[in-house]
């Protein structure tokens, strides 16, 4: 009997917390993003792409990204998802096959690892060439404490560092947004804000995220990466070879 009452109390407490969170979400100032319009149809394309670090992570991947795509790159850990994103933003990644971007394509990239951040957010805004006022406004919408603005980012929590990277990306006007595990260490309120933003603004995006609900709510295209064979699916199935 006592155990049943204890369980009931925990359930009531969890329900109250959820209701309170939903009220906070409704009151929260909405995030905004201003993507650049793309002049053509094709943003990026991969054909027979293979990535190998001594041994192949995957082979023969083909896909394309178009204006309006919010594509989730999915697959098991270590299968090469982050390597594809890094290759697409111009980093050196050992590969064969073709991965091309539209000429003049502007990309905004949020890497998975934020440990490199250091200095104050003011210094960071200056280095990145973004509007400091807008940057700070977005951080505050993420419930980022003002007291942190003057502190060294090296001492930030993982969630605070990820919010810095996301806020910087939201400040940037780009044709394509590439985000690697954007929800890592992020609180629930900020997660819902991001989900709502992407559902209403619909920027062209390629992202990696292990949160299945976020993928289901956000993506209109899924590139499923497997070692053998790669495949592409989506709400409107498209040929994998473009």
Describe each region flagged by the PLM:
Residues 1-54, 66:
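Coupling and communication elements adjacent to P-loop NTPase active sites across diverse families
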Residues 38-242:
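ABC ATP-binding cassette signature C-motif
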């Amino acid at each position: 009997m006592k155990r049943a009452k204890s369980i009931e109390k925990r359930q009531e407490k969890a329900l109250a917390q959820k209701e309170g969170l939903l009220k906070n979400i409704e009151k929260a100032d909405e995030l905004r993003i201003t993507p650049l319009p793309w002049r053509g149809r094709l943003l990026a394309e991969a054909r027979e792409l293979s990535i190998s670090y001594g041994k192949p992570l995957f082979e023969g991947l083909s896909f394309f990204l178009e204006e309006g795509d919010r594509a989730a790159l999915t697959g098991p850990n270590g299968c090469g998802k982050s390597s594809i994103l890094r290759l697409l933003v111009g980093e050196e990644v050992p590969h064969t096959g073709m991965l091309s971007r539209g000429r003049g394509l502007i990309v905004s990239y949020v890497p998975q690892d934020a440990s490199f951040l250091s200095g104050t957010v003011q210094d960071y805004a200056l280095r990145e060439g973004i509007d400091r006022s807008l940057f700070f406004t977005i951080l505050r919408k993420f419930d980022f404490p003002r007291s942190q603005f003057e502190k060294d980012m090296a001492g930030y929590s993982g969630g605070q560092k990820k919010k810095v990277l996301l806020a910087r990306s939201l400040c940037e006007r780009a044709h394509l947004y590439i985000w690697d595990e954007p929800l890592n260490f992020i609180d629930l309120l900020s997660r819902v804000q991001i989900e709502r933003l992407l559902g209403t603004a619909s920027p062209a995006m390629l992202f990696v995220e292990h949160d299945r609900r976020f993928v289901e709510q956000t993506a209109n295209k899924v590139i499923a990466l497997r070692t053998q064979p790669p495949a592409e699916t989506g709400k409107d199935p498209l040929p994998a070879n473009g």
